[in-house]
Amino acid sequence: MIGLVDGNNFYVSCERVMNPKLNGKPVAVLSNNDGCCVAMSPEFKALGIARGTPYYQLKDREVPKGNLIFCSSNYELYGDISRRIIQVLRERAVEVEQYSIDEAFIWPPSVAGNREQGLGNRDWYLEYGKSVRAQVLQWVGIPCGVGFAKTKTLAKIANHIGKKLPEGVFVMPDDPTDILAKLPTDEVWGVGRRLPLKLRAERIFTAKDLRDAPDDLVRSVGGVTLLRMATELRGVPCNQDRDYSADPDSVSCSRSFGEQITTMDALMESIASFTAQAATKLRRHGMLATGCNVYAQVAVPGMFKVSPEQREPRSGGYQGCGGGWDSSFYGYTVTFPEPTDATNVMVRAIHEQIGSLFVKGAKYRKSGIVFFGLEKVGAAYQADLFAPAEKREKSKLYVAIDALNVRLGKGKVFSAAEGVGKPAWAMKRSKLSKRATTNWDELLTVR
């Protein structure tokens, strides 16, 4: 049996931990730059407001029990509370595999090291789940749902059911046919939004239909990935050994600006800041980057002409159904003399080509950086014979800087290239709650 622990309305629950006055009130957490609602309390959902509704449409709205309450995304707080939940789970389970900021798979003591074990005593798992849920609530303050099943895919379904139960825990029965028959395919973990259309064309409407479909048909519709999901719906583990904490293939950082940028200095400051943040992630993973892609987005697509090489190809979140080019994104590629994790080396190399990204008169709304060609620190690579000796040695400078920023607060020590003071382009978080668990200057006051 494998369990899935998932924080209920996680962002809102984190806000309520630090401000109990929000309990029982309609609360929503906003996206970057206070754009739209990304997390909502049950009271907020009960008003019929859809997730993703823009903030400007709701900020002056009155409801019968008082005004709506909005909070800016407090990522520092959410990340710290997530870490605390994982610590509690590691106290109770022999194996813990974090899947996202608010979800983690757990293997209870009775099955750790024996993942093929069947359901066993369902009552034991039910009581164990209640105990784990109660401990997370008491120690961290976050309400959770817990689901147990033979596979990760079934555990996700069990968790979804458990969240709706008073006890917050559900153990999948040996034969989940009745449950799967009521579950649409678009609610199955990992199916996404596009595959259900293809599945319906093959008369596969529910999770039960997907489970019972022939392997060849499933593979033809969604490849090996969908076949694994179907196999897991049959109770046969396929994704048990996936490591969600494995080394990344790339590391990135990007933000939409609070105000549009019109100067090269401001554009360079934003890119230097995002480079520093991404480099910190690199060092945390113990990785070096061989190069990076730098890009920026203008407010008016196609407002000026650039060479084809300067256009940023659609990738990741920017790629449309047909691929191709996005005329609002422009960028360039930098290859470092040798793999590095040193922020100053990266910023210097990026700065040399920033002129190719900036055009006078353009208004920029976003910038970002993606490190690629990642290698483990200590791995063998071809060094640059002409590089200064100090570049080939592992510098302790950024180890010390990272340690200081952990101890004193994020961004306390930074490079001058990032600019001094809060820039106009910084992300808007006008309704930010206190970062009381990670910032000494924002500790809560007890009266």
Please state what every model-predicted region is.
Residues 105-110, 330-337, 376, 381-387:
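Short, hydrophobic beta-strand segments
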Residues 345-347, 351-407:
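C-terminal hydrophobic structural anchor segments
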Residues 195-363, 447:
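DNA-contacting surface of Y-family translesion DNA polymerases
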Residues 143-145, 293, 368:
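Residues at or immediately flanking beta-strands
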Residues 1-234, 240-242, 280, 389-447:
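Gly/Gly-Pro- and Ser/Thr-rich, intrinsically disordered tail segments characteristic of DNA damage-repair
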Residues 99-103, 149-152, 287-291, 362-366:
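Short Gly/Ser/Thr- and Asp/Glu-enriched loop/turn motifs at secondary-structure junctions
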Residues 31, 63-64, 298-300, 378:
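Short acidic-glycine loop/turn motifs at beta-strand connectors
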Residues 169-172, 185, 251, 257, ...:
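Short clusters of hydrophobic/aromatic residues that line enzyme substrate/ligand-binding pockets
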